[in-house]
């Protein structure tokens, strides 16, 4: 029972974004309004395989959230809204940052409804290593794509490690929501999450938008060993490219979802995996190494992998300074080119 409580608490922590400490603004009776978020400044040195090297800086990942909690008939009701500054983002040269809605949901007991993380995210996120890369954090998992990580409408029911999710479908021709069922547990120093995804996936190209049932299964694990932890995940299925981030036509972008998972009118299977290691060197210094890969069983045998390693130093409470190296075997987004990158960042949480 204690292990189930730990798993449920870990997931609840992520959905409430409590990795960013909240500051209580107002408390009146049983109602509390708080503010949280972080400010992140990053500089990225890029060395693409097919282009000239460059350097770009950004603070777009910075975010702010407001949370209201109250008791109604002995039930805790939570409302949460959060935004960052990726509203007009098409690359580092996108111009003046614009506010973007990340989360807007309400939660009562075991039910959460609104715009928030999808079911695939919860199936892997608690078992991942810590990454600095805003795009590509979960590559190699069924939640590798950040494009559809937070559907406009999501319904979660979570209780004692079990989670059922119905979310706004990616396919415009879907007859039902995309659905995810998962179960999480922690046994001593080992934790796992097993999940199944079902969705109406497009099989056509351009105007031929017929759909078929796409099914996928995933397993994510974490093994704690002293001051370190081993992380691993694997998934396989058909119709999963819109969530993994890799399509039969290459890296996912919002314009190719209709043909993402199909070839010659048929859904194509794909398999992905990731392995990682996290180590806490001192109370202030920690590091992570990770490898993620996705392979598609299409005519071109499409495959992409990403390698990364980082060090993060807690300079002051709530103030982290970090550096991360990463290497992509192919382009994953127009602004995430094939080749190497080094990111240097500072992040203050409040």
Residue ranges and their predicted role:
Residues 8-13, 19-36, 121-123, 138-141, ...:
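Outer-membrane beta-barrel biogenesis signature
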Residues 23-46, 53-180, 184, 222-223, ...:
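Outer membrane beta-barrel
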Residues 44-48, 71, 85-90, 118-122, ...:
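Sequence/structural signature of outer-membrane beta-barrel proteins
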Residues 55-59, 94-101, 146-148, 172-176, ...:
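Transmembrane beta-barrel outer-membrane domains
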Residues 62-66, 104, 153-155, 181, ...:
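Membrane-embedded beta-strands of outer-membrane beta-barrel proteins
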Residues 73-76, 110-113, 159-164, 189-194, ...:
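Repeated loop/turn-to-beta-strand initiation elements of outer-membrane beta-barrel proteins
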Residues 186-306:
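Detector for outer-membrane/organellar transmembrane beta-barrel domains
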Residues 223, 313-317, 338-350:
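Outer-membrane beta-barrel "beta-signal"
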């Amino acid at each position: 029972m204690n292990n189930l409580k730990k798993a449920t608490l870990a997931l609840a922590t992520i959905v409430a974004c409590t990795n960013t400490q909240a500051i209580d603004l107002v408390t009146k009776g049983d109602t509390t309004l708080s503010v949280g978020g972080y400010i992140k400044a990053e500089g990225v040195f890029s060395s693409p395989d097919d282009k000239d090297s460059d350097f770009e800086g950004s603070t777009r990942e910075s975010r702010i959230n407001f949370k209201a909690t109250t008791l109604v008939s002995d039930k805790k009701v939570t409302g949460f809204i959060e935004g960052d500054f990726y509203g007009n983002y098409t690359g580092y040269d996108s111009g003046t940052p614009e506010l973007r809605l990340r989360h807007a949901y309400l939660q009562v007991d075991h039910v959460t409804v609104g715009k928030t993380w999808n079911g695939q995210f919860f199936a892997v996120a608690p078992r991942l290593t810590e990454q600095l890369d805003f795009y590509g954090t979960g590559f190699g998992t069924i939640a590798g794509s950040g494009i559809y990580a937070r559907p406009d409408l999501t319904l979660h029911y979570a209780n004692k490690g079990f989670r059922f999710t119905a979310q706004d479908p990616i396919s415009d021709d879907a007859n039902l929501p995309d659905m995810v069922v998962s179960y999480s547990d922690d046994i001593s120093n080992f934790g796992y999450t097993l999940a199944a995804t079902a969705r109406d996936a497009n099989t056509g190209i351009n105007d031929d938008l017929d759909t078929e049932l796409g099914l996928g299964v995933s397993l994510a694990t974490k093994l704690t060993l002293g001051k370190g932890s081993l992380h691993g995940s694997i998934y396989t299925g058909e119709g999963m490219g819109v969530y993994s981030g890799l399509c039969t036509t290459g890296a996912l972008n919002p314009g190719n979802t209709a043909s993402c998972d199909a070839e010659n009118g048929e859904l194509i299977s794909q398999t992905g995996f990731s392995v990682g290691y996290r180590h806490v060197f001192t109370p202030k210094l920690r590091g992570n190494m990770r490898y993620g890969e996705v392979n598609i069983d299409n005519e071109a045998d499409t495959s992409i992998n990403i390698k990364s390693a980082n060090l993060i130093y807690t300079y002051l409470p709530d103030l982290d300074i970090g550096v991360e190296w990463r290497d992509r075997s192919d382009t994953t987004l127009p602004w995430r080119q094939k080749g190497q990158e080094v990111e240097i960042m500072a992040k203050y949480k409040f």
